[in-house]
From Swiss-Prot:
Organism: Nitratidesulfovibrio vulgaris (strain DSM 19637 / Miyazaki F)
Function: GTP hydrolase that promotes the GTP-dependent binding of aminoacyl-tRNA to the A-site of ribosomes during protein biosynthesis.
Residue numbers binding GTP: 19-26, 81-85, 136-139
Annotated Pfam families: GTP_EFTU (PF00009), GTP_EFTU_D2 (PF03144), GTP_EFTU_D3 (PF03143)
Family indicated by similarity: Belongs to the TRAFAC class translation factor GTPase superfamily. Classic translation factor GTPase family. EF-Tu/EF-1A subfamily.
Protein name (database record): Elongation factor Tu
Positions of the UniProt region annotated as G1: 19-26
Underlying gene: tuf
Stretches for region G2: 60-64
Assembly information from the UniProt record: Monomer.
Residue ranges annotated for the tr-type G domain, each copy included: 10-207
Length: 397
């Protein structure tokens, strides 16, 4: 049996469960696959299979993540669930599993707990754009007023962290009851069906990479006699057509040029698009004007910045990270896309140091500007080894 071919008939959305430990994230994930499976939209993945998620390495960081997939009438979902709290933090910060939306699971028996807060804050910081709430274990709460109270508390917490708390769908149910039923039309399965409907209607279809403004991180620069300068790299998003204007952004002053040729596998094309490894021929550019670490981009689509706020996970000693804490004034390298740039870290007021294994929010000032926008991922390196992973949460200047 070869691998099944992935049939792309429906739009694809990446989603995941977040929330406090033991509030039922994994049970809900299993229940979704079961109910979707009973409705003929995927195959059931049992709790134990999800719970013993294999460990994966993302930029040298070990993360345990379970991936399941299921469909609704209109969409194909890829869903991530992490067994441990630390795995969530690493997952969200490294972007190992980019989420177009998240399902926040809150046990009605407990209400919002510390990790509920932390996951909402992280979702905000790393740019998970939409959340839907599943109020779990509602079968264990007899008091309707108590349910109302917990729902209100969750909505207020979401608003506090910048999500539209009043508008977010909140579905009440029991993940365990949904997991135990074999009838997709039963009252026990209904909340999971309602949750899937809420995901379909509330989480917008993500814009595809190809529809975004053109951007290609520059990996290499060649000069071809009689033709000019060629920059190579993998197109991250958008489309570049021969004859279009482009900008070279980052490290130095922004320079304008025109793309006079696109080639791939030594063949000339009239355009390159997201995912293609291409060489782009640039008019009027000298080889020494361009370097690895800059980006080729659609005019005015991205600006260079030096100072930003970051949400960062610092590798533990066991993951090959530092053995000692660092303090304000620490100067490691920040690896953005294709290159390392030195930066100086300023910890938040009242934070004395950051220990290996911590996640932290701090400010970074680079020695040279990089083409940057909110949500850009980076690695922190020291002498060539990765000691942290982060995401730009806010641009300061």
């Amino acid at each position: 049996m070869g691998k099944e071919k992935f049939e792309r008939k429906k739009p694809h959305v990446n989603i995941g469960t977040i929330g406090h430990i033991d509030h039922g994230k994994t049970t809900l994930t299993a229940a979704i696959t079961k109910v979707a499976g009973l409705r003929g939209n995927g195959k059931f993945v049992a709790f134990d299979e999800i719970d013993k998620a294999p460990e994966e390495k993302e930029r040298g960081i070990t993360i345990a993540t379970a991936h399941v997939e299921y469909e609704t009438a209109t969409r194909h979902y890829a869903h991530v669930d992490c067994p441990g709290h630390a795995d969530y933090i690493k997952n969200m910060i490294t972007g190992a599993a980019q989420m177009d939306g998240g399902i926040l699971v809150v046990a009605a028996t407990d209400g919002p707990m510390p990790q509920t807060r932390e996951h909402i804050l992280l979702a905000r910081q790393v740019g998970v754009p939409y959340l839907v709430v599943f109020l779990n274990k509602c079968d264990m709460v007899d008091d309707e007023e108590l349910l109302e109270l917990v729902e209100l508390e969750v909505r207020e917490l979401l608003s506090l962290y910048g999500f539209p708390g009043d508008d977010i769908p909140v579905i009440r149910g029991s993940a365990l009851k949904a997991l135990e039923t074999d009838d997709p039309n039963s009252a026990d399965a209904a909340p999971v069906v309602a949750l899937l409907d809420a995901c379909d209607s509330y989480i917008p279809e993500p814009q595809r990479d190809i529809d975004k403004p053109f951007l290609m991180p520059i990996e290499d620069v060649f000069s071809i006699s009689g033709r000019g300068t060629v920059v190579t790299g993998r197109v991250e998003r958008g489309i570049i057509k021969v004859g279009e204007e482009v900008e070279i952004v980052g490290i130095k002053d922004t320079v304008k040029s025109t793309c006079t040729g696109v080639e791939m596998f030594r063949k000339l094309l009239d355009q390159g698009q997201a995912g293609d490894n291409i060489g782009a021929l640039l008019r009027g550019i000298k080889r020494e004007d361009v370097e690895r670490g800059q980006v080729l981009a659609a005019p005015k689509s991205i600006k260079p910045h030096r100072k930003f706020k970051a949400e960062v996970y610092v590798l533990s000693k066991e993951e090959g990270g530092r053995h000692t804490p660092f303090f304000s004034g620490y100067r490691p390298q920040f690896y953005f896309r294709t290159t390392d740039i030195t930066g100086i870290i300023a910890l938040a007021d009242g934070v004395e140091m950051v220990m290996p294994g911590d996640n932290s929010t701090f400010t970074v000032e680079l020695i040279a500007p990089i083409a940057m926008e909110q949500g850009l991922r980076f690695a922190i390196r020291e002498g060539g080894r990765t000691v942290g992973a982060g995401v730009v949460s806010e641009i300061l200047e």
